[in-house]
């Protein structure tokens, strides 16, 4: 089974999250993340993918949600702890969006709605 890790990075005011545009559609945004590589833990994958896609270092990732879709597993973590400057060498845009925009992704609206609801349920 293939596994992908997403990381919900929430800013200090708890009102915005860091989003990454899709590589082939700069008008649609999602969470930073990607596939788990050989001999990598889920947390290591999340840290690596965030660094690659945003330039930020993230710390203290907490489990939020897991979904199975056919032969693909997607696990989402969240954190409020990050350091560094936003920059990317990949072909996408990185920007802060209001947390309520999380469920507006065109491609991932169902999954992101679940993430949004799980985050709201935490009452952080």
How would you name each of these model-derived features?
Residues 9-13, 22, 79-81:
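Active-site beta-strand termini and strand-to-loop segments that position acidic
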Residues 30-36:
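Adenylate-forming
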């Amino acid at each position: 089974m293939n596994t992908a890790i997403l990381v919900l990075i929430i800013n200090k005011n708890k009102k915005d999250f860091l989003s990454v545009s899709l590589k082939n559609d700069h008008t649609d945004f999602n969470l930073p993340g990607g596939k788990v590589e050989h001999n990598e833990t889920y947390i290591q994958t999340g840290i690596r993918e965030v660094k690659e896609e945003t330039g930020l270092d993230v710390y203290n990732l907490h489990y939020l949600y897991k979904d199975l879709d056919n032969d693909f597993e997607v696990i989402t973590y969240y954190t409020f702890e990050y350091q560094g400057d936003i920059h990317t060498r990949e072909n996408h845009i990185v920007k802060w969006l209001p947390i309520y925009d999380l469920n507006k992704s065109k491609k991932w609206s169902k999954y992101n709605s679940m993430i949004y609801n799980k985050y709201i349920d935490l009452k952080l």
